[in-house]
C-alpha cells in the first residue's frame, strides 16, 4: 500500500524542450503566401498595363483606311502624349488635290457650312448595285430627292457607316443581299416612285450610299442630293502638305498640354473634280515609345514602393495587434509565481489559439514572451524550427501556462 503514491503520474507533464534546433517554421508559409499575393498583384497590374498599351497602339491609334469624296474634311486629333506623328498615305495615287494641314498649340479648327448639289442618273442593272462614298462631319444635313423609273419599280437606298466595297478586290466585296438587307445600316429605305429623304449626321465618320436593285429588270434611278456639309477652316494652319509623293507626315508637338490637330481635305466640286472622283487614304500613327516606357517605369516604381510599405505595415501591424499581451509577457518573465500574473494569464486564456482557433491560449514563447497559441500548436512551431509568429524572434522554449 505504501508504494502506490510512487506509481501515480502527475496531472501535467511538460515535455523537455529541444533547445538546440534551428528556427525555420510553420509561419514561413505566411511569408510565402504574402509573397505570392504580392507577385500576383504585380503581375496582374503589369499585364493590364501591357494590354492597355497594345489596345492604344493597335486599337485606338491603329491604322485605318478611309474613302473620300469631293468636299471632304477629316479632323484628326490624337493625344500628343502617346502619338509622335501622323502619317497619311494615298493608296490610290491617281487623282491630285488632297491636302494635309497641321495645327500646333492652337484651338480646335472652327467649322463652317458648305452647300452643294449632286444630280445623279443611275442605270442599275438587275440584281446589282451602285454606290459612292462620303465623309461627313457632325452637323451635316442631307436632302435626297429621288425618282424611280419605270413607274411601280422599287430599289433599296442604304447608307452604311464606314467604307463600302466598290473598287476593292473581289474577296473584300459584300454580296448584293448583304448590302440590301444589312441590319447594321445607318439608314435603310425602300424607295419607289418619287419622294425625298432627309438625313442629319450626328457622328463624324465615313459613309457609303448604295442603291441596290433586287429585281429581275433594269431600273433607272434619278437622285438629286442637296448637301449642307460642315468643313474645317484651314486658314491658320502651321503645316501644309500636298501629297506630291503620295504621302504626308505631321510631327506632333512634344510639349504638353499643347494640343495638336490635323485636317485632311479633298478638293471641292468644280475645280476639275467631278462627283464621281474618289480618294482612298490610310491614316496611321507613330507611337511615342518613350511615353509608354516612362509610364511602365512609373507604374513599376509605384508597385515596388507599395509592396515595400505593405510589408512594413504588415510587420508593424502584426506586433501592434497583440501589444496588449505585453503585460502578460513581462509578468511571466519577471515572476512565474506571481498572483497578478496568473490573473492576467487567466484573462488571456479567454481568447482562442490564433493558429487552430480551437483550444485556448495556454502557452507563451520564450524569450519574447508572446502568448498567441495553445500549447500543442506552440510545440509544433518549436519542433519544426519555427520563430515567434508575432515578432519573428528565435524561439528557445515554449512555456505552458497552467490555469485552475
UniProtKB/Swiss-Prot annotation:
Name of the top EC class for this enzyme: transferase
Species per Swiss-Prot/TrEMBL record: Arabidopsis thaliana (Mouse-ear cress)
Record has Metal-binding as a keyword: yes
Zinc fingers typed RING-type, residue spans: 353-392
Gene Ontology BP annotations: mitotic cell cycle; pollen development; protein ubiquitination
TM spans (from-to): 42-62, 289-309
Protein name stated in the entry: E3 ubiquitin-protein ligase APD3
Gene: APD3
Gene knockout outcome: Plants lacking APD1, APD2, APD3 and APD4 are defective for cell division in male gametogenesis resulting in severe abnormal bicellular-like pollen phenotypes.
